[in-house]
Each structure stands twice: as C-alpha cells, then as structure tokens.
Amino acid sequence: MSKAVTYRSGLTAGDAESEQSGELHAGSIAVWRPTAERPIRVKRLPLIGVLGSGPVGRGVATLLARAGYKVTLGTRHPDSLVLLELPVSVTIGPFDEAAKADVVFLAVVHSASRGLVESLEERLAGKILVDADNEWARWHYAATGLSDSLTEGSWMASLLPHSSVVRAFSHIDWDLLVTRATDEPGVWAVGYASDDDHVDRLVETLIWDMGYVPVKIGSLAESAPIDPGGVLWPRILTPDAMRALLDTGEESN
C-alpha cells in the first residue's frame, strides 16, 4: 500500500504535475528530462538530507548540491568534517538535522544503519528514505549478508514502516559515483526499486539531476539485482546494458 509522503512546506508527491508547456507559475519549478515527454512541475525543490559522511554520502551530497539542491550532510561528529572539500551549499550537521529534510539518503556503515534509522524513525515518518547501504557476507565480499530470501530494501522498509523506502545507488562503486556523472552525464544508469509508485517520478528526477539515467528494476522484494551478489552489483552500466542483464542475464552489444 502506498504511503502519503508530505514535505515540510506542504508539498506532496502528487504536486509533481505533468504539464504540456514550460510556462512557470509563481513559486514553481519546471524540470525537463531528456527522455520525458513533459516537464515535471513542483512547487519547490525538495530539501535533501544525507546520513553518512563516507565516500558515498559525500558523493551524493556533492552531485545534488551541484544540481542546485540544498543539502545537509549528517554525521556523528560534525566538527570533524569542516575541512572536507564539499560544495558551499552543503551544510554539515548531526544526523538529526539531516533527517529533517524532505528526501533522506542513507549511506552509513551497514552495521550502524539499524540503530541509526530506529533512532530517527519518528523523524523519518512520511518521508522518502533512499537506501544506498550494503550488507555483504564476511566470508565473501560479493554476497549479501542478509538471508537468502530478504533484500536490503525489504529489510530497511521493515524498520521504517511509516516511510517510503527506495533502494538506489547501491551498485555503483563509490570511487566512480561522482566522476562518471560529472564526465559523462546522462550516459550511465542507476537501478532503483520501490514499493510506492507515486514517489518514483520524484526519485527519477533526483537521479537525472545527479547525472544518471534512472532504471526501475521492480519492487523492494525484487531488488536483489542491486544487492551484493546481484547481477548488477557492483557494476556501472548503460541503461540498455542494465535492462539486458535484468531481462536475459546478458549484456547488450
């Protein structure tokens, strides 16, 4: 069942209206995507929070800040990050401050993720949580550490029953996250999964703005391909190659 996602200013995912023209109304922003038939109009850009100051968290914050979003990078020790090279529009603060945003990305060490999201469950209620964490088996880097029948996305959704969990950015090596989007924007795909179709367009807009092409691979229960051990993990692929792997297990030429 879809959850109602309401932002602090009163903007809901339903306010992302499709319009034929690019005419702007006061207080709205039209966003055009290369593969979209019509622009997406929203009342304002959502505020972004990132939980985790490691390479993935910093990469996500950097790409979204460059795209014009206001980003709060949350960390356990904010004062220790003052010298990091980040866009000036990125604010560094505690986890609780980052969790106040409209859309929150999770990019912490997996062993810390459960305690963190449970402590922020009330703050994250009614929001979109984009889970980029990975749990891999200690005995095998390329195998999930969760049970065979449980995906990372489904596990995270069970911890946050009042949030809309989206699984994304889990299959791209951290050292390529910023460079591929910067050097070749709109070329490489990000596979994502969700159970709430009404948040997909907003998530896809964020992925486009970060320099990637969104490819939905299914529901959270179907997100094993972007978990450790999955056919897409850890790989960076074009949209056609990603779809071919998902459909046939073979890359397109």
Residue ranges and their predicted role:
Residues 20-83:
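NAD(P)+-binding Rossmann beta1-loop-alpha1 motif at the extreme N-terminus of oxidoreductases
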Residues 44-47, 126, 187:
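Phosphate-coordination loops involved in phosphoryl transfer and adenosine-cofactor binding
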Residues 51, 187-253:
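Active-site-lining helix/loop region of Rossmann-like oxidoreductase modules
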Residues 59, 63, 159, 206:
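Rossmann-fold NAD(P)-dependent oxidoreductase module
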Residues 89-92:
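Rossmann-fold cofactor-recognition segment
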Residues 94-128, 133-139:
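Rossmann-like NAD(P)-binding element
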Residues 133-175, 180-181:
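Rossmann-fold NAD(P)-binding glycine/threonine-rich loop
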